[in-house]
């Protein structure tokens, strides 16, 4: 129905799954669990701009060595299944494939975690070999992004993300302002599920930032949501 109306659907898939999911229950060897089925380490991200204690997600981590021994079959089937329902697939926390933040089970914050090397290109080469080289994947490449993460993304020509609010807000990062993009291989977002709505965000900004947006877009700011869409479309 969507295709008949020239609409394409973008799906969204998290890198990690929940401890109480059927994925973990049915595939315990794929995860870092103890003999009772509890995680030995859990997922999260270190302290950053958004949080002084990081984010403790609590998901069980993958046993990547075991995944490799299976030819990454579980991941291949996961991607294959998702692409039967959508045209494109955004993978959340893409940087976790290059290196992931492992927090010892029982910690109350993510502060005491450690960066552990992920499967890197080995995983995506296996997915390409099974599903073809032109797999329609977007990489959520926000947060702590290193040159190694960018290299992994670019090796497979996965589009990254540009969030307009990051370019005009107090982060003041020109990499997210359309006319400063250094690549066309990216997806421009007005915001994400982690952001306020565009109008809500705009109304909370100091007058200096509001004025900057109005001057950048030659607009009065009364329809800033549509202005941001225009910025994206003109990028």
Where in the sequence are the language-model features?
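Alpha-amylase-like alpha-glycosidases and glucanotransferases acting on alpha-linked glucans and related
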Residues: 16-235
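Conserved, well-ordered alpha-helix/loop/beta-strand core segments that scaffold catalytic motifs
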Residues: 1-14
